[in-house]
């Protein structure tokens, strides 16, 4: 399910218009845009085990996010966005957690992700999906194809 913040059931009006509203926020005079980070707390390895231990360890991710917002250059660029540089996220005391498992960018995974997002958009937004959102998905798809 592609439902960031689990908000889809609570949209009080057309979901496409809801997204379009959020896209206009940066157009306001003096707008201070939020920094947006994506975290997949539920990523699983090939054996079906969660890659990240969760719970209190999530504070480690939040610490990295805060340092990023504070201007620290602790990320590397990938076709899907910025991820922590190796060593930038505190993994001390987590012997079963692998940096490469957390931050590898797999072409098959992202090809599937793009297909699923496209289906989600079609099913939930149809023609009401703002063109900017589809343009971002198409740009992501192109970057994934070049991996």
Indicate where each model-derived feature is located:
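Conserved NTP phosphate-binding and transfer environment spanning the P-loop NTPase/kinase superfamily
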Residues: 1-147
């Amino acid at each position: 399910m592609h439902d960031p913040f689990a908000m889809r059931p609570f949209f009080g009006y057309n979901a496409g218009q809801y997204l379009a509203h959020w896209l206009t926020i940066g157009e306001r005079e003096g707008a201070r845009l939020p920094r947006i980070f994506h975290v997949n707390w539920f990523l699983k390895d090939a054996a079906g085990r969660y890659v990240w231990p969760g719970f209190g360890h999530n504070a480690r991710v939040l610490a990295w996010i805060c340092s990023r917002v504070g201007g620290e250059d602790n990320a590397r660029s990938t076709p899907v966005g910025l991820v922590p540089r190796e060593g930038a996220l505190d993994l001390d005391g987590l012997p079963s957690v692998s940096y490469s498992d957390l931050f590898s960018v797999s072409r098959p995974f992202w090809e599937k992700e793009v297909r699923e997002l496209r289906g989600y958009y079609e099913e939930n937004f149809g023609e009401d999906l703002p063109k900017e959102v589809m343009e971002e998905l198409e740009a992501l798809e192109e970057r994934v194809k070049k991996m």
